[in-house]
């Protein structure tokens, strides 16, 4: 083939350091928009970004030249720096790890609705229960002793 064609969709999830409720509601919409901008600047497409005080969800389309580890490094470091400089959250940190789960095109709308409904969703279930449920749904093996560091 003369060109490379790729469809790589990832539902990415990561929390604040020690799952602290560090992302105040007044910063959230700006943070989600900023994360989308970091994605655009790095040739990714952020189809959806959202979350709550202690974690973020992104639905990303990655170019064929980018690894998921590279994408997470750019988004997490860029958004952390932005929170330090623009919001005065100088002690803010994301956790070291993340979850990245592939989805098919038929799952885009459901994943976007899930991301958009985070505030409502977390009135009933905390982040830890949510993340373990995602791991199970995607068939990811894990040792509960090491999920949270």
What do these predicted regions represent?
Residues 1-149:
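Basic nucleic-acid-binding interfaces
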